[in-house]
Amino acid sequence: MLWNWVALVGGIISAVVFSYILQAAYFHELSLLSAVILGIVLIAALALRAFAGKKSVQASYFASTKVKHELRSLIYRKLASMPLNQVNQQSTSSIIQVASEGVEQLEIYFGRYLPQLFYSLLAPLTLFAFLIFFSFKTAIILLICVPLIPMSIIAVNKIAKKLLAKYWSIYVGLGSSFLDNLQGLITLKIYQDDAYKAKAMDKEAEHFRKITMKVLTMQLNSVSLMDLLAYGGAAIGILTALLQFQNAQLSVLGVILFILLSSEFFIPLRLLGSFFHVAMNGKAASDKIFTLLDTPVETQQSAVDFEAKNNVQVEIKDLHFSYSEEKPAITGLNLSILPNQLSVFVGKSGCGKSTLVSLLMGFNKAQQGEILFNGQNALNIDRTSFYQKVSLVSHSSYVFKGTLRENMTMAKIDATDEQIYACLEQVNLAQFVRDNGGLDMQLLSRGANLSGGQIQRLALARALLHNAELYIFDEATSNIDVESEEIILQFIQQFKQQKTIVMISHRLANAVNADCINVLDQGKLIEQGTHKELMEKQGAYAEMFQQQKDLEQIREVANA
């Protein structure tokens, strides 16, 4: 704002000098020396205006950049402070939209609209205070016309606020639908439902187009009204000055100044009106941003550190959990997971295996019952200390874009190359890494340049480097090659003597050597024991095991 005002002062000085030169020339009073001096002053005033204008742009840029950085940092810190189950409740597309375009809109609000708002109030008062010495009548007419633009802005604001709130709501909804359909495109293709979803998206896109056109129409009408008021007000001021000059009530210098400076009364407010539309869009975005920032974080009551130095024992007591009231996912579950053993959970799809993992990891919170880790209630354990002692290797392990070293050191930031290679050796990846550039090997997002088995082995190596006390494998061997599956299973068998291991598996052959097999059905524990004990019992486990064995034999014959 200050630099804008300095630029205005430079403009006033240049207008005065230029007007004086014209007046002196009109009355034949301009000497060569005075012309040179006045020319130098004019150039200096114009240079001051240009310099101040440049500094104003720079100040606006630095202010808006700082606001943008601070807002995105606040959003990141807010999401980082939330427990994972609360983060999962947030819409991914909504977060992306408010953190990207929403913040960009607010950047304009803070970087341009607010400085222009204060300058728009200061500029007419400065010009009035200067021009009043030449003609009070013309100066007061110009000043009276100035409030007409803010009045039009206030009138438009009432319409714009509701319209832009609706616009952003539809925009975020369209983004959510697009992301959901894109992520589920393969499933839609399989079930031949993609055409239906395409039509639904066409309707949403058309709805968004209509609301966008309404916003543009409102903005164009508002701009036209402000142009009429701005240039109409300037024309009235100039006409009044000319009439006073005709009646010998205003000097040549004065009339030229009014001609040159009348528009300066209105240009700042006219620019404010232009920024206003973007600012209102940013205001609508800010409602979404501050709704996220004001979301209460689910905090733990008297959180304590997780005490797990060597052995971890897990006790589950009367556990109940459901995603909806109609269908419970876990019902009255009671069991113990003993330290330094391999405990495997099996069952049909939808029996509650992965739900149990989400409860063990704290991604979801049980409605009833408790989970105890070494006697400590999971609800009272500090999440940071908990995740230092527990590692999860899921069927969808994520590989980040960057070097292999960067991916590995996420588990241990100060890990040496020797420690990383030691972990890679245990999953039979060390030689592959050496042959492909070593630890500086570039990995694509989601490990696009690795096979599914290599991704899982890399995830296991990363978990090993983390050196947790409790390892949870959630379908870690599903949909990978036989070699990688055997490497992972052999490692788990060797590793179970040192750590507590929980494994979720749909393939029962992987559970044969487990110390304890837990069979789930509709969220309940229906059988428990070793492979031998459960086969002798001839219950649900034995039936599923035999069915899978028969299917695998049929597949082998078909592939032979």
Swiss-Prot record:
Residues 1-281 form the ABC transmembrane type-1 domain. InterPro entries: AAA+_ATPase, ABC1_TM_dom, ABC1_TM_sf, ABC_transporter-like_ATP-bd, ABC_transporter-like_CS, P-loop_NTPase, Type_1_exporter. Pfam families: ABC_membrane, ABC_tran. This is Uncharacterized ABC transporter ATP-binding protein HI_0663. It comes from the Bacteria. SMART domains: AAA (SM00382). Keywords: ATP-binding, Cell inner membrane, Cell membrane, Membrane, Nucleotide-binding, Transmembrane, Transmembrane helix, Transport. Residues 314-547 form the ABC transporter domain. The chain crosses the membrane at residues 2-22, 32-52, 108-128, 138-160, 168-188, 223-243, 249-269. Belongs to the ABC transporter superfamily. ATP binds at G347, K348, S349, G350, C351, G352, K353, S354. It comes from Haemophilus influenzae (strain ATCC 51907 / DSM 11121 / KW20 / Rd). It is a multi-pass membrane protein. GO terms for cellular component: plasma membrane. It is found in: Cell inner membrane. Its main location: membrane. CDD domains: ABC_6TM_AarD_CydDC_like (cd18781). GO terms for molecular function: ABC-type oligopeptide transporter activity; ATP binding; ATP hydrolysis activity. The lineage of its organism: Bacteria, Pseudomonadati, Pseudomonadota, Gammaproteobacteria, Pasteurellales.
